[in-house]
Each structure stands twice: as C-alpha cells, then as structure tokens.
C-alpha cells in the first residue's frame, strides 16, 4: 500500500471511530423506542441514504460491475447479518444501561482484529502483540473465575464487528456500493417487521411527533457515515493497523457513560478494563515503535 492510501485510511479511520464514540448520545435521545424498531429504521433509512449518495456521486457503474460477481453479493449478505446483529446488540446495550460494557467490547475489538488478521490473512504476530492478546484473554478469564460473570455483550460486539471487518477486507468491495448491497439484503426483513409486526407506541410514524420521526430518519446518517469511513479505511489499511484506532470510540463511550449517564463500573468490570487497557497500551507502544523503526 502506498503512502497516499495509508494517509487516507488513517483519516477515514479517525473519523469513523470518533463518530461511533459519540453515537450513544444519539441513541439515548430515542431510548424509549424499542431496540428492534430502531434497528429497522437504521436499515431502511440507511438504504435510502445510500441510494441518494450513489446517485449524487454517480457510482452506479460500481454496482453494475459488482452484480457480475455473485460470490461477492453472497459474501455481502454474510457481512450484512454480522453488522445487523452488531447494530441490534449495541442499541440494546446503550439504552439498557450497558454502555460501559459496550465500550469494553470495542476496547477488546482491536485485539480480536489482530487474531483474525493472523488466522485468516496471514499477518504475523510480533512478540508484544502476543503479550497484548494474552493479557486481554486473562482479563476476561479473571472476571469469569473471580466474579463468576462473563462480559457477553462486550464479547458479542467485539467478535461480530471484527468478523465484519474481516469479511469486508476479504471482499474488497468499494465502500458505498458494499453498504448499499448490505442494507438491500436487510431491507425486506426490516420493512416487514416495522410495518407488519412491530406494535408499540412509536412503531407508527404517522402518529409520531415530527421531532421523533426526524430523529429516526437521522439513524440512516448516523449509521452510514461512520460505517462508510470504516469500510473505506479497511480497504486502505492492514486489519491489524486498523485496530490501532479502535481505542478512540470506546474511550469516548466510557467517558459518556461515566460522566453523563451515571453508569458506575463494578469491581468485575474494572478488573477486565484494567487488563484491556494495559494490553492496548502495549499494543499501541509496539505499533509506534515498529512504525518508527521501519520508517528509518
């Protein structure tokens, strides 16, 4: 990868993780809407937002080319399921006072990226990366052994998003086109659920206040902008390098949870956080050292 691509990837990754970091504040505004309904709005409005964006950017030629490769279309169905599950779990966690555990999941994610990069992409571990991964595993095991609890939400978010990044990396599809196909795969299920199954005080848009409807429509923008930045970054950076930026989002989530939303980490969570933070510190220092050494 050339220097220009790397610089673009860095900027895109920074933008993606910053927006993701403050995204919980948006979902807190619509906390009274069921998580499954918010998910359907994310899918539906993301699809239409992508159609408009593709038209403005005149990128329909990419879609025509992609349609000629059915294998990639099928793999985008797999990535759609992964990201859809990740979205649902994240929304539920934020609006059910588990923002801290959600942030833990995204702290763990960079280390999962390293493991997947080694297993599926042939990326080699350095010794310090091994140490970081082992410390992260120890943090989860200590919580399980000492406190008898397992950070299910955190692990679910970490692994679903890591596998999503891996699949998108392997497919190597242009970011906007891939996002359009993913939401197109999810659209029928989302539409059927919202208009035929969902039955709550907020499921009928014709009866909702305009302010709520605008917030629900905004789910498309909140969803697609950072995800487009992420998928574009994933095609320009090594998966392990992409993991370097992941700490930005969960740090912002952690600060939001503790400072603005009154969540207090218990002893079990703090033990795991401590291990993960030390692991990430080692990972970051190793990445900086390696980058400086190779640039000489």
Curated annotation (Swiss-Prot):
Annotated ranges, domain EamA: 18-145
Subcellular location per the Swiss-Prot or TrEMBL entry: Cell inner membrane
Matching PANTHER family: ACYL-MALONYL CONDENSING ENZYME-RELATED, SOLUTE CARRIER FAMILY 35 MEMBER G2-RELATED
InterPro entries: EamA_dom, RarD
Organism annotation: Escherichia coli (strain K12)
Cytoplasmic domain ranges by topology: 1-11, 61-72, 123-128, 168-179, 235-238, 291-296
Main localization of the protein described in the UniProt heading: membrane
Gene: rarD
Cellular component terms per the entry's GO annotation: membrane; plasma membrane
Periplasmic topological segments: 35-37, 96-99, 147-149, 198-211, 262-270
A matching Pfam family: EamA
Sorted UniProt keywords: Cell inner membrane, Cell membrane, Membrane, Transmembrane, Transmembrane helix, Transport
Keyword Transport assigned: yes
Entry's family note: Belongs to the EamA transporter family.
SUPFAM superfamilies xrefs: Multidrug resistance efflux transporter EmrE
NCBIfam families noted in UniProt: PRK15430.1, rarD
Transmembrane segment boundaries: 12-34, 38-60, 73-95, 100-122, 129-146, 150-167, 180-197, 212-234, 239-261, 271-290
Topology class, membrane: Multi-pass membrane protein
Protein's UniProt name: Protein RarD
